[in-house]
Amino acid sequence: MAWRDRRGALRAILEGSACVRPASVYDAISIRIADDLRFPLGMFGGSVASLAILGDPDSALITLTELAEQMRRMARAAALPVLVDADHGYGNALNVRRTVQELEAAGCAGLTIEDTLLPQAYGEAKPQLISSEEGLGKINAALDARLDPSLVIIGRTGACSISSLDDAIERAVAYEAAGVDALFFTGVKARDQLQAISAATRLPIVLGSPPAELADWEYLAAQRVRIAVQGHAPIAAATEAVFRTLSALRDGAAPQQLTGLATPELMDRVTRASLVDERGARFLGLARE
């Protein structure tokens, strides 16, 4: 699927009437599994990128180059549209332009730019926001940097949990007026908050990790929520599986005694082994087994 087709698929989700729950993806294998399972969308989060690439918690240490290269690997591996959490754009508004250029070239379907002050400021234990003016400048820079008009750019605010609901709405309305394609809110905890956001804005809404009170997909869809991100369980599950397997091997288990491993058939499927064999036969004169 060409980049524009993937971006069109994401736009179709935003223009639709359902609330989609994307697959958390972070490498070539995870995106292929999500694609094979027919998820409509992948989400490449900043926290999961930090885990997968650096083995670090979500502490804003990853670089744009590392993020874009990982996105490029995933885009080559499967045709699933991917929405990338581009954090703060890796600097000021001029850095945001570069971020959009690199992620667009890497094949993402869309990206989010947020207003959290990153990296963490000296002496500040709690998250902080950049000013509304700086946040709007970043959004305008992102929109200006977009070469493919089908690339989805989403303005994200954490104001609900950091400052106030009113501040979140004010920032979102400004991003909407600037021309973003959707609005991403984190920290929304209650229905009355979401309803206030929905009433004050017009664009499709993306929610980050909605709590149990909001985990009603029909209700969310009625409030114009088109994407609800549900955290990053796959990488946690993979980490547990590797830990258990290596622990068993360390304790003397023989490989044939291990349980919970992918079958050879599943490994062939996610590595696209039959396609590699086919290409070997076509281009290298190799007999297919």
Curated annotation (Swiss-Prot):
Q: At the top level of its lineage, which domain of life is listed?
A: Bacteria
- How is the subunit organization of this protein annotated in UniProt? Homotetramer; dimer of dimers.
* Species of origin: Rhodopseudomonas palustris (strain HaA2)
Q: Is Transcription among the key words of this record?
A: no
Keyword Metal-binding part of the UniProt annotation: yes
Protein residues bound to Mg(2+) = D85
Q: Extract the InterPro entries matched here.
A: ICL/PEPM, Oxaloacetate_deCOase_bac, Pyrv/PenolPyrv_kinase-like_dom, Pyrv_kinase-like_dom_sf
Q: Can you tell me which family this protein belongs to?
A: Belongs to the isocitrate lyase/PEP mutase superfamily. Oxaloacetate decarboxylase family.
Cofactor list: Mg(2+)
Tell me one GO biological process term: propionate catabolic process, 2-methylcitrate cycle
Gene Ontology molecular function: any one = oxaloacetate decarboxylase activity
Name of the protein described by the UniProt record: Oxaloacetate decarboxylase
Enzyme nomenclature, EC number: 4.1.1.112
The protein's job, in short, is: Catalyzes the decarboxylation of oxaloacetate into pyruvate. Seems to play a role in maintaining cellular concentrations of bicarbonate and pyruvate.
| Record-listed substrate binding positions | S47, R156, H232
Record's keyword terms, sorted: Decarboxylase, Lyase, Magnesium, Metal-binding
Q: Which Gene3D superfamilies match?
A: Phosphoenolpyruvate-binding domains
Give the Pfam families listed for this entry: PEP_mutase (PF13714)
Q: Cofactor: bound how, per the entry note?
A: Binds 1 Mg(2+) ion per subunit.
Catalysed reactions listed for this entry: oxaloacetate + H(+) = pyruvate + CO2
